[in-house]
Design a protein with these regions (language model features):
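Phosphate-binding/catalytic loop of phosphoryl-transfer enzymes
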Residues: 85-166, 195-208, 265, 275, ...
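A short acidic, often aromatic-flanked loop/helix-cap motif at beta-alpha or helix-coil junctions
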Residues: 33-35, 94-98, 243-247
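Short glycine-aspartate micro-motif
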Residues: 2-6, 63, 127-131, 220
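ATP-binding/phosphotransfer module of carbohydrate and carboxylate kinases, centering on a glycine-rich
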Residues: 2-4, 160-292
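Short, hydrophobic alpha-helical segments
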Residues: 47, 123, 252-256
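Phosphate/pyrophosphate-binding loops at sites that engage ATP/ADP/AMP, CoA/4′-phosphopantetheine
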Residues: 43-61, 205-217
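Short beta-strand-loop/turn "lid" adjacent to the catalytic site in phosphate-handling enzymes
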Residues: 51-107, 144-150, 155-156, 184-195, ...
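Short glycine-rich, Thr/Ser-proximal phosphate-binding strand/loop in the N-terminal lobe
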Residues: 2-45, 55, 146-171, 176-180
Length: 292
C-alpha cells in the first residue's frame, strides 16, 4: 500500500492506495505551527482505527504534495517514519508525463500538477481539470500533453464566508444545491449566487478555454465542494472525488527509487524502459452529462 499525503490550505488528506484503488481516506486540520511529532500523533490516531492484529497497516512507500511550505518538512518526516523511506515529493523536476508549457513551472501549485498528470494519463486529450476547494482551480493539458496553465478563482466556500463576515445583514449559510436560480429569501439567494454561480463559472470558463484550444476538451471535476456544483453544470463532465490521491499514486509509480513502473495512462516517458506494473484502470471515455 502507498501512503499519499495531500497538504492543502485547510486540511491534510491521507490516503492509502493499493493496486490503483483508494482503500481509505482520512483528514486532519492544516495547522501551520504543528511539529512533526504533533502531526505524527494525529496520524497515529487515524491509523489506529484501521489496524487489525492479522492485517496491520503497512506502507511500502509514500508520496506527498503540498501547497503549505511551512509544514512540508514535518509531514515528509512523518511519511519517512511510517515507510522507512524518503517520500516522493511532487515538484516540476519529477516525472509526470507532462511537458510544462508555462514560464515558471515552480510557481504552479503542486496539487494542480498532480490533477493534470492523472487526467492526462487517463482521459481523452485535451483535458481540463477543475478542483473545487478553498480556491477553484482550472488546469489545461493540450493534445500534446503540454500543461498550458489554467485559471484560479476564489473558492465557493471562501466567497460565502466572506459575504457572511463582510456584510452585516447576510448570514452564514450551510451549503446545498439550490433548486432554482431565483432565490426567495436571503439564504436561497446566497446559495444561488454561490453554488449555481460556480456551476455557470465552470461552464463558461471551460467554453472559453475550448475556444482558445480550438477544439472540445474533456472536463474532469474534483474537490470536496464539487458534489454541490456538478449537478448544476451543463457541460459534459466526469466527477472524481479521488482524483488527486490517484494522481499521487501515479506519480509514486513513476518516481519511486529502484522501481520501474509503466505509466498509468500508457505513456512511456522518453529514455525509460518501464515494465508494466499493475497500472490503474483507464477511466471510461464516456463522461457524465448533467444539466442544471
Amino acid at each position: 500500500m502507498i501512503l499519499a499525503i495531500d497538504i492543502g490550505n485547510t486540511t491534510v488528506a491521507l490516503g492509502g492506495i493499493k493496486d490503483g484503488r483508494v482503500c481509505f481516506v482520512a483528514h486532519m486540520d492544516t495547522v501551520r505551527t504543528r511539529t512533526a511529532a504533533e502531526y505524527r500523533a494525529e496520524m497515529e490516531k487515524v491509523f489506529s482505527h484501521r489496524r487489525h492484529p492479522e492485517r496491520p497497516v503497512r506502507f511500502e512507500g509514500a508520496v506527498l504534495t503540498s501547497v503549505v511550505p511551512q509544514i512540508t518538512g514535518a509531514l515528509a518526516e512523518c511519511a519517512r517514519h511510517y515507510t522507512g523511506k524518503k517520500p516522493v515529493i511532487v515538484s516540476p523536476e519529477i516525472r509526470t508525463g507532462l511537458t510544462m508549457g508555462v514560464p515558471d513551472p515552480h510557481a504552479v501549485g503542486k496539487d494542480r500538477i498532480v490533477d493534470a498528470a492523472y487526467a492526462a494519463a487517463n482521459f481523452p486529450l485535451p483535458v481540463i481539470t477543475v478542483d473545487l476547494g478553498t480556491a477553484t482551480t482550472f488546469n489545461v493539458v493540450d493534445e500534446n500533453r503540454v500543461f498550458r496553465g489554467g485559471v484560479i478563482c476564489p473558492g465557493l466556500s471562501t466567497g460565502l464566508r466572506a459575504l457572511g463576515e463582510r456584510c452585516a445583514q447576510l448570514p452564514q449559510v450551510h451549503l446545498s444545491s439550490p433548486k432554482n436560480a431565483i432565490g426567495t429569501n436571503t439564504e436561497s439567494c446566497m446559495l444561488s449566487g454561490s453554488v449555481l454561480g460556480t456551476a455557470v463559472l465552470l461552464d463558461g470558463i471551460t467554453a472559453r478555454i475550448e475556444e482558445e484550444l480550438g477544439r472540445p476538451a474533456t472536463l474532469v471535476v474534483t474537490g470536496g465542494l464539487a458534489k454541490y456544483v456538478t449537478p448544476l453544470c451543463r457541460h459534459p463532465l466526469t466527477y472524481d472525488p479521488e482524483l488527486l490521491l490517484k494522481g499521487l499514486a501515479l506519480l509514486y509509480q513513476l518516481n519511486a527509487p529502484q522501481q520501474h513502473h509503466y505509466h498509468a495512462g500508457g505513456h512511456k516517458p522518453h529514455g525509460q524502459n518501464f515494465r508494466r506494473h499493475r497500472p490503474f484502470r483507464r477511466e471510461r471515455r464516456e463522461t457524465e452529462a448533467k444539466a442544471g
